[in-house]
Amino acid sequence: TITPSLKGFFIGLLSGAVVLGLTFAVLIAISQIDKVQRSL
């Protein structure tokens, strides 16, 4: 019973990391676009 829970834990951890990465990427992209628009 240890293996399935461990697998689920890793899947949850991986999906959480992916979501965090995407969120950071979007925030960085928005800030970069904002800088470009201000410079123009």
From Swiss-Prot:
Subunit structure: PSII is composed of 1 copy each of membrane proteins PsbA, PsbB, PsbC, PsbD, PsbE, PsbF, PsbH, PsbI, PsbJ, PsbK, PsbL, PsbM, PsbT, PsbX, PsbY, PsbZ, Psb30/Ycf12, peripheral proteins PsbO, CyanoQ (PsbQ), PsbU, PsbV and a large number of cofactors. It forms dimeric complexes.
Residue ranges annotated as Cytoplasmic topological domain: 29-40
Coiled coil: none
UniProt cross-references to Gene3D superfamilies, sorted A to Z: Single helix bin
Record-linked HAMAP family: PSII_PsbX_1 (MF_01386)
The organism of origin for this protein: Thermostichus vulcanus
UniProt-listed InterPro entries: PSII_PsbX, PSII_PsbX_type_1_subfam
Lumenal compartment spans: 1-11
Lineage of source species: Bacteria, Bacillati, Cyanobacteriota, Cyanophyceae, Thermostichales
Keywords, sorted A to Z: Membrane, Photosynthesis, Photosystem II, Thylakoid, Transmembrane, Transmembrane helix
Major location category of this protein: membrane
GO CC entries: photosystem II; plasma membrane-derived thylakoid membrane
Family matches, as Pfam families: PsbX
Cofactor binding note from Swiss-Prot or TrEMBL: PSII binds multiple chlorophylls, carotenoids and specific lipids.
Bilayer disposition of the protein: Single-pass membrane protein
Family per similarity comment: Belongs to the PsbX family. Type 1 subfamily.
Entry's transmembrane regions: 12-28
Record's protein name: Photosystem II reaction center protein X
A GO BP entry: photosynthesis
Compartments, as annotated in UniProt: Cellular thylakoid membrane
Described purpose of this protein according to its UniProt entry: Involved in the binding and/or turnover of quinones at the Q(B) site of photosystem II (PSII). PSII is a light-driven water plastoquinone oxidoreductase, using light energy to abstract electrons from H(2)O, generating a proton gradient subsequently used for ATP formation.
